[in-house]
């Protein structure tokens, strides 16, 4: 029977006889004495098998190899001074093995080394194919334990301190337009009809508020059939919350307290409150982003009014046609960023063009503090315009000023990407710094140029600002996003709870009354039976864990993730199914594999 986990043993256990289980992380033979590093999820402890002191275990220890599974019983002893290991928590003790029992051996060559001591970089496809081995590695085991600690902290705070109730909502539901494609499943017992996997529990949690539950939360599984990247998966996990009778301010305050509790409990970090707040307009104006990383400066400066009457046609025409001209000021940029990098073929030009920009204009500030204009800008800015640009940007000797000109969305996207790239190159990002901020006052709608219609910026159940009800199409939403170091980790809003306003929003996004009734009739009817004011928020758990773990991809904080092609390399899903299954579901595939 196990008495301890490997990583638990300390000086206070010296003299005790202990039993534990684990995997052989490493085996070493020093002058006839066998040393084993035994590993389990808690860490590593050193085992000693000396033929003089523990002859009964020596033969077994000598036969062990990496990743063999064993049971060991022995005595905890003090390590000699010269072999103390301060790098691990158990480094002051070692176990003299009295009994070693082999539980299972390794029958094949390992596809990669699992040992803590091994520093090789393993290809991600191998790690995903043999995920059960990858999860034995110290880093991955720690990531999953961190994830567990975060979820536990969330649950304890919400239940014990705020009175929330955890409720599960359906996984099999109906398809509703929420922004991304749904994953759909055919119904065998209802031929020709389909379920959808939920993109979020949005409508059900609102219905729980109609039910009078008052405060709900759920660790919810969500599914979206969208293009993937490092911080997206087809299935993901949210901390989902909904509250009745609370203002936006009260919801924000509660969630700041929740986040502070998580950081304090899990990382021992005291966060400063209140968190910074920016409106959507301020975020776009200063950073070109609604999720800015504020750990560094490099704020954008709008100079549209300065250059609107300049001799530079590109700037003049841009402003005349309703566009903007903004500058990304880069201190000491002259010394590092060459003209070649900004012109076609250069890395910064490529970064800008991928964001939709057609080109980059720039000026340099000489060592004497004067502007050194080049190319098409030369002689097309008056001295007064040059001096006003210097004043507004605060540019000094050595500054490089990168211009973006065009539609506001393209300019902001371009300069946001360049801002991030420059910050990385100039090492302006402090990895230990934690900057949290709220973005508020989002627009209710954005224009979908492909479909020639308005669509909800968040979702169509977000409540408009009460001051903007006279013109919903230009209204601000009562929405709020929480941003951590440039990554959106949470987003929520006050909800519409009156049928008339909900119908107006459906109409604004192009849903006819008949379509609205067909898709959301159950919600509209619920609003007839005394719906309370309510609002909520959802946190991307995978992203939050990724950031707290210091990882670059959410795949490294999910036990069994998919690739960027939405495949599981471990189980080879998705896969084909046999004709009998398809027949039972009344489904036929029209896909023809390429020859």
Swiss-Prot record:
The record marks 30 as: Important for tRNA non-discrimination. Homodimer. Keywords: Aminoacyl-tRNA synthetase, ATP-binding, Cytoplasm, Ligase, Nucleotide-binding, Protein biosynthesis. The lineage of its organism: Bacteria, Bacillati, Cyanobacteriota, Cyanophyceae, Nostocales. Its EC number is 6.1.1.23. It is found in: Cytoplasm. It comes from Nostoc punctiforme (strain ATCC 29133 / PCC 73102). ATP binds at residues 224-226, 233, 488, 540-543. It catalyses: tRNA(Asx) + L-aspartate + ATP = L-aspartyl-tRNA(Asx) + AMP + diphosphate. One of its GO terms (molecular function) is nucleic acid binding. This is Aspartate--tRNA(Asp/Asn) ligase. The gene is aspS. Its main location: cytoplasm. GO terms for cellular component: cytoplasm.
